[in-house]
Amino acid sequence: MKILIQKNSKNNKLEKNIVKITKIGIIVFISFSILGQFVPFFEGSNSYFYGMASILFVEEGITKSNPFLEKYETNEFLLDNWLRTDQNEMIPMSGNGLILLGGIAYVFGGYFALYYLSPILFIILIIASERTATKLFGKYAGLITLILLSASNLLFRNSIQLHTESLFCLLFVLGTYFLIKFGRTNQSHLILISSIFFAFSSTVRLSGIILF
């Protein structure tokens, strides 16, 4: 009987180690892949908007003056993804949460921080998703979650550029985790934390939160 118990214990330990090594291997592989294939923000349309808006947020504030817009007061001189204010200034149309985070990254790391911001957020996303699924549903659920996210070509392609997808998904996953924990424990502070993550995710990608 003791021999069987020891044998099962060794098998379980070996199984856990294999799962852990597999998870670490996937994370390391996908991290090197996305960091090695990032696209500078000035080479894309939406990523250029988010990158420049982040820089302007630090250097000039959330609004941007436009002499032609102030003089002629017509939308013909309004740039894509920008809105005109009553004072004939321009403000970003969307993604203010990412612009704020991008501005903070730009202050500390300059242009290189904006280059790597979205890939780093993607790496944090897959790690946070794996840990969330593991804590809530077990180690195999965490492994499956990690595989599905790492194999998502759409999420990977969006994350090599300065887009909103990785940050939105990260905030939504964290909000969902605390919401589920609230349902299990009925601790009121968890619903507050969950609401904060959901609220901030709406500043990153409003259309995404509406779809969910």
Spans of model-derived segments:
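Transmembrane-embedded, aromatic-rich helix segments that form part
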Residues: 169-170, 192-194, 207-212
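Interfacial juxtamembrane loops and adjacent helix segments
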Residues: 56-106
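Start-transfer (signal-anchor) and selected internal transmembrane alpha helices
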Residues: 1-42
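Loop-to-helix entry region of an early transmembrane alpha helix in multi-pass inner-membrane enzymes
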Residues: 85-124, 158-162
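Short acidic/glycine- and proline-prone juxtamembrane loop motifs at membrane-interface regions
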Residues: 154-168, 207
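Short helix- or helix-capping micro-motifs
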Residues: 142-150, 177, 198-202
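Membrane-interface transmembrane helices that cradle and orient dolichyl/undecaprenyl
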Residues: 134-137, 175-191, 201
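Transmembrane-helix motifs of polytopic, lipid-linked glycan transferases
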Residues: 28-30, 113-137, 170-178
